[in-house]
Amino acid sequence: MKNSSIILVLVFFFFISSSGEAKTCSDGWTCVGEDKCKVNCMAKHKGVGTCTLYIIPSFPAPITSYICDCMFDC
């Protein structure tokens, strides 16, 4: 009985501690400047925005675009 009580307490503690973690979500839009990306991300989601260059392979030339990657807690 004593061992099962300890296991029950440990399982309960693990469940409570893991349920409180924030998940990370993301949003993205066309980047019009690093500073504007950071400001818009903070205003929309209270997150951190970074301009990232994405290269999409295509023929005859690859397509490149800058996207504002906004990472925030859900």
Curated annotation (Swiss-Prot):
Compartment annotation: Secreted
Alphabetical UniProt keywords: Antimicrobial, Disulfide bond, Fungicide, Plant defense, Secreted, Signal
GO terms for biological process, alphabetical: defense response to fungus; killing of cells of another organism
Cellular component GO terms, alphabetical: extracellular region
Signal peptide start and end residues: 1-22
Disulfide bridge positions per record: C25-C74, C31-C51, C37-C68, C41-C70
Main subcellular localisation: secreted
Taxonomy, superkingdom: Eukaryota
Family statement: Belongs to the DEFL family.
Listed name of the protein: Putative defensin-like protein 186
Organism: Arabidopsis thaliana (Mouse-ear cress)
Taxonomic placement: Eukaryota, Viridiplantae, Streptophyta, Embryophyta, Tracheophyta
Protein's gene: LCR40
